[in-house]
Every structure is written in C-alpha cells, then in structure tokens.
C-alpha cells in the first residue's frame, strides 16, 4: 500500500474552477491561489444566503487513541460515497495546524484514498490563513505593549495582561517568557507567554464570525487586560479593531479544494477541540449548506469535546442543526478502552471489545440527548477480525443504533457506500429534534455541572481558588450568560487521561477560567491541558524533506 503522500501525488488534480462548477460556483466567484486552491468571494457568499439549506451531517468519534481514529478520513470518504450514490455533497473541514503536522500527526488532510488535495499545500502554508491569524494576534500584542510604553492612557496593570502572543508551532520553550528586557526603549518588562495559533481567540472568532462586520464586532470585544482598578480592557478601548479586521479581510474567506474523487471541499479555520471549540468556520459550513444538498463536517477529538462544543457553541450560529451524527469507532480504540495495552492492540480480543464498548455506548447516548439521530461508523483496519467486527455490530444492535463498516482509507468512496446509504436513509426517515444541553440563562456553574454530569458521566465539579474568584468577577462583568468551552484531555471522559472506558465515580476540577468575550464563550481549564503543546522525542519533522524537483516527502 502506498503512503498517504504517495497516493496524493499520484492523483491528477482538476483545476479548482472546474471542480466547483458542480455546486454552482462560477469562475468569477472565486479568487485563485494557483490552479488547485481558491477562496470564495464575499459576493458569492452573500448571493447564496437566501438559498435553501441542505442536510448537515456531523462526524465525531469515541475517545481516541494517541494515533487518532480517522474522523477526517471518514468524513472525506463519506462525502465521496454520498456523491457516488447521487447525493450532491460538499465537505466542510478544519485546516491543519503546522505544529502537530511537524510534531506527531505528520499531516491532517485525511488518509489513504480519502484525502483532500493538494495535501502538501493544505498541511503547510495553504492560503496563508494561519499566518494572517498569527499576525493579527501578535499585532494586538505589539499595539497593547506600545500603549503601555507610550504613557498607558488606559491605566493598564501590566501584571494583569491576559493576552498572549502566538506561533503556529509546538514550542514548549515559549510557554512562559519575559518581554521588554534591556533598556527602557524596549518597552515595559512584564511576564508573557506564547500559545499555539489554533488556541488564539482570534482563530475562534474567525470561525464563529458570520461576515466582516461581525468579525470586526467580535474582535472589538476581546478582553486583553485589566486596569489597575480591575476593570476589563477591551480591544475597542485600544481602538485597533479596524486594523485587526484589515489583517484578516482575506483570511475570513473560506478555502476551496477537492478530494481525490473530485468532491468540492471548504477547508477553513482550525481551532483545537481540547483547548478551543474544535470546529471549522461557521461561514464555510453555512455557505456549503446553501450550495449542496448534503454537507459533511467534523468536530475535533471525541464527542465529549468537539461534538458537545459543535452542538452547544457552533450550532446556534448556523442556519440549521445537524440532521445526523456519525460516531467513528475503531476496534483498536475500543480494545484500549477495554484494558489492552497499545502494544497488543493488533491481537484479537473480543472480551476487550465488549469491555471497551461502554465508551462508545456513552457517546451514542450523549448525542441522543441532543435529539439528533446517530449512526456508528466502524473505521476498518487490517488487524480487525471477523469475530471482533461481528461482536461490535451486535453490541450496537442491542442499543438500537445503526452501524456500518467502512474501509474508505483503503477503498475510497467504494469503501463507504453502505455507510453513505445508511446515513442518507436515517436522514430521510428520522427527524432531528435538536436541543441544547443548557440554556444561556444558566449560571457558569450550572452549565459546567450539566456538561460534567450529562456528557462526561462525572459526579461533582470542584472550582479551584482562582476559579472561585473568577466566578464572581465574570458575573459582575456580565460574562456569565455565554456558553462554556471545556478545556480537557481528549483521551478520557474525565480530566485524567489514564481513566479510560466509561468511568462514573469521578469529579472534575476547574482550576481557572479564560474569558473569550470576542468569540462569545468562557474557557474552563481542567487537568493539565496546555495551550502551547510540545514536540515528541522523535518529531514527524525528522522524516520530512523536499526533492530537487520540489516534491515533498515525509508528510502522511
């Protein structure tokens, strides 16, 4: 079997202008970035706002193994298969962050014969969105520090600056830094730090904004610091929201690419799901829904993180709610949740599948709480045995959830035909009665308690000393009616990454809150979740290179 990049490089791509014709996008509607990438114009986005909205399919997963469970691959393969059975379909996905590409993942554009292309471009600099977001974020930092240096008219307490710089890399050495060192001409010394770009609030804002004016409004509402009398300082106080919007005026336009099978794909925005809301842009998803009859999108990590945030944070900003939720499961992950070590996952173990099924079952029941029909997709691997597959299908049947085996990585669209037909049938025969998990009027404590007890299966929520102080502060500032974005490990329902399966007897501790008032949600930090990842001992970058003819190698 060829590697992902070998498969991608063997495909004869069609010009993107030709690909998008099938969904009614003309040459004058796009802004080309070479032959195979383009951005959708504002004029076209506005022109389709009044069109009929299609069906929305959300792809999520069980709690993943460190290698991931193939959500993006399954999303792409499902969309290709839906097109093959005659459903006019588009994909709306996140764009990768360069940090994880160089770190563990080595790439994030699907895999095998279910990829979005050109994968080298998408995984590296793409159309420059990440750089624009990084620049906007750091321009804000520079302008903020300059304000303090040039007299500090707003009386900003330099000890209470909460806005951090960002870089689109995994770089643990930058988590805590001191800026302004040297002579007085270098600014006022203060503690600072770097987050990874995809954790920036500006990334979240870009992904939730509905148009340029909404983008500007959200940017103006970012809290960057507090004054010496403890009042929040907003971007609008610095009067720089116009400049930040200018930097992002092209980045907000969704990117158009294609799959191996020629399915049009909108790949735009990329917040992490463990430290941010984990969904691609509202603008891309909303536009796709008006261009196609079916739209496949995904939310990061397991359903306890990405899907919960999609349904409670993103969906209220969309023109419709999901018509079906597809939960991706792998037998290797179920066996890991059933107590099997990573080294033994390739060995048949039906008992472990049964034990690990509790994780999938909880995710299915959780998604049903939102009133949306659920389908389970088994992402097939070569080590899966017939006994294990049959066992999993029986277990799914016992809880009355539709289940299909899919081999889209190996077989492309053909490997997802049965899944596509089942998903289409579910949408056509079952109605979605979407409802949020909590109400805006609920307090911050009430919202978090509902997430912890109803989604995670936990007992109680504890608030650390800093979080307790912030609860009153946020209420006084009028921030308590916003949705909650839980920052939690992706490997477990709990805040302990080693507590696998479907644990029940555990509590969650919130150590700190971060106001994302521009994006419109509050981040609750739990466990040891970091907003700037580090690199592994042997980063994927060690295997990357470029040949003399410019061909990339080592991306996967």
Swiss-Prot record:
Cross-referenced InterPro entries: Formate_THF_ligase, Formate_THF_ligase_CS, P-loop_NTPase
Family matches, as Gene3D superfamilies: Domain 2, N(10)-formyltetrahydrofolate synthetase, Formyltetrahydrofolate synthetase, domain 3, P-loop containing nucleotide triphosphate hydrolases
Disulfide-bond pairs as recorded: none
E.C. code: 6.3.4.3
Group of enzyme by EC: ligase
SUPFAM superfamilies: P-loop containing nucleoside triphosphate hydrolases
Residue numbers binding ATP: 65-72
Catalytic reaction equation(s): (6S)-5,6,7,8-tetrahydrofolate + formate + ATP = (6R)-10-formyltetrahydrofolate + ADP + phosphate
Family: Belongs to the formate--tetrahydrofolate ligase family.
Record-given protein name: Formate--tetrahydrofolate ligase
Protein species of origin: Streptococcus agalactiae serotype III (strain NEM316)
Gene: fhs
């Amino acid at each position: 079997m060829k590697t992902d990049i070998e498969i991608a490089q063997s495909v004869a791509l069609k010009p993107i202008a030709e690909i998008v014709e099938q969904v009614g996008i003309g040459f004058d509607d796009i802004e080309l970035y070479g032959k195979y990438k383009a951005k959708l114009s504002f004029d076209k986005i506005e022109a389709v706002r009044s069109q009929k909205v299609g069906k929305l399919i959300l792809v999520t997963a069980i709690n993943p193994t460190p290698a991931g469970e193939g959500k993006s691959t399954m999303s792409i393969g499902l969309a290709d298969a839906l097109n093959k059975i005659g459903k006019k379909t588009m994909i709306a996905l996140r764009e990768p962050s360069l940090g994880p590409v160089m770190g563990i993942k080595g790439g994030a554009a699907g895999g095998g014969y279910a990829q979005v292309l050109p994968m080298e471009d998408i995984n590296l600099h793409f159309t420059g969105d990440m750089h624009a977001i990084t620049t906007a974020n750091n321009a804000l930092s520079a302008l903020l520090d300059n304000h303090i240096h040039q007299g500090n008219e707003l009386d900003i307490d330099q000890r209470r600056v909460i806005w951090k710089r960002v870089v689109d890399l995994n770089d643990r050495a930058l988590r805590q830094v001191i800026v302004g060192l040297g002579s007085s001409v270098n600014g006022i010394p203060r503690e600072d730090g770097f987050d990874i770009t995809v954790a920036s609030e500006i990334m979240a804002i870009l992904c939730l904004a509905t148009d340029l004016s909404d983008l500007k409004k959200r940017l103006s509402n970012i809290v960057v610091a507090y004054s010496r009398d403890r009042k929040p300082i907003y971007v609008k106080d610095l009067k720089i929201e116009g400049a930040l919007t200018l930097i992002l005026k092209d980045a907000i336009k969704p990117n158009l690419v294609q799959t191996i099978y020629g399915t049009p794909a909108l790949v735009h925005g990329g917040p992490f799901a463990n430290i941010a809301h984990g969904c691609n842009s509202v603008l891309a998803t909303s536009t796709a829904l008006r261009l196609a009859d079916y739209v496949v999108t995904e939310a990061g990590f397991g359903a306890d993180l990405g899907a919960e945030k999609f349904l409670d944070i993103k969906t209220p900003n969309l023109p419709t709610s999901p018509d079906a939720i597809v939960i991706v499961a792998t037998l290797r992950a179920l066996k890991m949740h059933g107590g099997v070590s990573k080294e033994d996952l390739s060995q048949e173990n039906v008992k472990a599948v049964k034990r690990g099924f509790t994780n999938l079952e909880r995710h299915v029941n959780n998604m049903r709480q939102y009133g949306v029909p659920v389908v389970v997709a088994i992402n097939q691997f070569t080590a899966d045995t017939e006994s294990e597959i049959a066992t999993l299908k029986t277990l799914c049947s016992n809880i009355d959830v539709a289940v299909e085996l899919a081999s889209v990585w190996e077989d492309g669209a053909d490997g997802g035909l049965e899944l596509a037909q089942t998903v289409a049938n579910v949408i056509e025969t079952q109605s979605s009665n979407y409802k949020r998990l909590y109400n805006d009027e609920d307090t911050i404590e009430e919202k978090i308690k509902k997430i912890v007890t109803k989604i995670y299966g936990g007992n109680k929520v504890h608030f650390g000393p800093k979080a307790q102080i912030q609860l009153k502060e946020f209420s006084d500032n009028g921030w308590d009616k916003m949705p909650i974005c839980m920052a939690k490990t992706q490997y477990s329902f709990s805040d302990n990454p080693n507590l696998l399966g479907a644990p029940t007897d555990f509590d969650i501790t919130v150590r700190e809150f971060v106001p994302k008032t521009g994006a419109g949600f509050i981040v609750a930090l739990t466990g040891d979740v970091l907003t700037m990842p580090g690199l592994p001992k042997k980063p994927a970058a060690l295997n990357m290179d470029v040949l003399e003819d410019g061909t990339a190698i080592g991306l996967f």
